[in-house]
Curated annotation (Swiss-Prot):
PANTHER family: OSJNBA0084A10.13 PROTEIN-RELATED
Domain of life: Eukaryota
Any one of the GO BP annotations: gibberellic acid mediated signaling pathway
UniProt name for this protein: Protein SLENDER RICE1-LIKE 1
GO CC terms in record: nucleus
Region (Leucine repeat I (LRI)): 84-140
Expressed in which tissues: Expressed in elongating internodes and flowers. Expressed in floral meristem, stamen primordia and tapetum in developing anthers. Expressed at low levels in roots, shoot apices and rachis.
UniProt similarity note: Belongs to the GRAS family.
Bias (Low complexity) ranges: 458-485
Species the sequence originates in: Oryza sativa subsp. japonica (Rice)
VHIID (motif): residue ranges: 189-193
Lineage: Eukaryota, Viridiplantae, Streptophyta, Embryophyta, Tracheophyta
Chain residue ranges for the region called Leucine repeat II (LRII): 237-269
Induction data: Induced by treatment with gibberellin (GA3).
């Protein structure tokens, strides 16, 4: 394998009457009686069953191809008109909500429910309209709070979304390629994952490092995730699976979990950065959840300060290319409606099988839609922002952009080409990559480093309180950061 080339390995998903009997109907009467009604009076001894079909009951000729195409085009046009009307009804409802007109919003919502019947559920706008109509209903008529989705349920839906479409695979591949290139020539490397989930991203990186000319480095992974409500150390479970893989490909490996309800609870000392190791931070669809209303102090600042203080070799950031952090409800609703319509269209095209897998992937997206539509203030977490705004924010935090090379662009296009659907495209913009659908960017990937020195090895890192990188101090009890549910150290796995 060529140096710094990431392998494609993803271990771990109407002639209706034509059938009538020709002797079934008698011929019509030749003479009409005075009452104006035609009667048939067969001659004596005539075999009624042997009579030929009357001319008017002959089989209809099949539709000409041009006529069938015209009918299909007319139906599509009718559905398109119905879809446009439904979109206008949903936007009118959102506008009435923003204006505080509950009665008008309720009437528009009722019309939206009725209009859904005229839109095909197989179309992107038809499926997404169901979710937005449901979300508007929940906002207008709040019901008793349902139990929140458990982490296990979220992980289940996340896995189906991963399998159904190219977006998360694109995110993992692009980030891993940048990390692999940043670690070139480094003997001790440390990846800090802001959202470990099931660890789906890391088997491919471990395999790529195993194939590195000159031998693999010593790899540490610190995985951050929420505390388990059952008390089971799920982070450690993921670490054990990764350790088994690393052992099988002869990569020296250490894993450590850090449990935190929010990323701003994590402090640099909890990461146990070791002197001399090259550090990479990785964030896939996480940073937008740290944003807040303009009047509030957002947790994003503390997290970016933490990243900058460590001075990493690379900081990979994948985010939705959307603007769902607007203060005006109608603007936010409109942007989300068209964004998710494109995502649903692409999801349908990417998955040839459809079925339950697609339904679970859509359920994953439905949670985001409900948060954007129903949530306000601190209750709203899905605050997606476009790449241009992330550039400004990350630059202010003391980070510099690292261009994603032509190699990453070429291989990302190859990866996306493995999925069905010709509408997907990967484009490069100012050193960043975007994955879009029919020309609309939907996800962006960028890479960053500490400004000034381009990042580097942590030879004199003042935030580290541990020398070495064995990660063998399992079950340490980390200090709370002043919150009642502060971050804590998790178990470690070492090879």
């Amino acid at each position: 394998m060529a140096m710094d080339t990431f392998p494609f390995q993803w271990p771990m998903d109407p002639a209706a009457s034509s059938g009538l009997d020709a002797g079934f109907l008698p011929p019509p009467a030749a003479v009409a009686p005075d009452d104006g009604v035609g009667y048939y009076d067969p001659p004596a001894g005539a075999d009624v069953d042997a009579a030929a079909l009357p001319e008017f009951a002959a089989a209809f000729p099949p539709c000409a191809p041009d006529a069938a195409a015209a009918v299909l085009a007319m139906r599509r046009e009718e559905e398109e008109v119905a879809g446009i009307r439904l979109v206008h009804l949903l936007m009118s409802c959102a506008g009435a909500i923003e204006a505080g007109d509950h009665a008008l919003a309720s009437a528009q919502l009722a019309d939206s429910h009725a209009a859904l019947a005229a839109v095909s559920a197989a179309s992107g706008i038809g499926r997404v309209a169901v979710h937005f109509t449901t979300a508007l209903s929940r906002r207008l008529f709040p019901s008793p709070v349902a139990p929140p989705t458990t982490d296990a349920e979220h992980a289940f839906l996340y896995h189906h979304f991963y399998e159904a479409c190219p977006y998360l695979k694109f995110a993992h591949f692009t980030a891993n390629q940048a990390i692999l290139e940043a670690f070139h020539g480094c003997d001790h490397v440390h990846v800090i994952d802001f959202s470990l989930m099931q660890g789906l991203q890391w088997p491919a990186l471990i395999q790529a490092l195993a194939l590195r000319p000159g031998g693999p480095p010593f790899l540490r992974i610190t995985g951050i995730g929420p505390p388990s409500p059952t008390g089971r150390d799920e982070l450690r479970d993921v670490g054990l699976r990764l350790a088994d893989l690393a052992r099988s490909v002869r990569v020296r490996f250490s894993f450590r979990g850090v449990a935190a309800n929010s990323l701003d609870e994590v402090r640099p000392w909890m990461l146990q950065i070791a002197p001399g190791e090259a550090v990479a931070f990785n964030s896939v669809l996480q940073l937008h959840r740290l944003l807040g209303d303009p009047a509030d102090q957002a947790p994003i600042d503390a997290v970016l300060d933490c990243v900058a203080s460590v001075r990493p070799k690379i900081f990979t950031v994948i985010e939705q290319e959307a603007d769902h952090n607007k203060t005006g409800f109608l603007d936010r609703f409109t942007e989300a409606l068209f964004y998710y319509s494109a995502v649903f269209d692409s999801l349908d095209a990417a998955s040839a099988s459809g079925g339950a897998g697609n339904a679970m992937a859509e359920a994953y997206l439905q949670r985001e839609i409900c948060d954007i539509v129903c949530g306000e203030g601190a209750a709203r977490r899905e605050r997606h922002e476009p790449l241009s705004r992330w550039r400004d924010r990350l630059t202010r935090a003391g980070l510099s952009a690292v261009p994603l090379g032509s190699n990453a662009l070429r291989q990302a296009r190859m990866l996306v080409g493995l999925f069905s659907g010709e509408g997907h495209s990967v484009e490069e913009a100012d050193g960043c990559l975007t994955l879009g659908w029919h020309g609309r960017p939907l996800f962006s990937a960028s890479a960053w480093e500490a400004a000034g020195d381009g990042g580097g090895d942590n030879n004199n890192n003042s935030n580290s309180n541990v020398s070495g990188s064995s990660g063998s101090d399992s079950n340490n009890s980390g200090s709370s950061n002043g919150k009642s549910s502060g971050a804590r150290d998790g178990s470690s796995v070492c090879l």
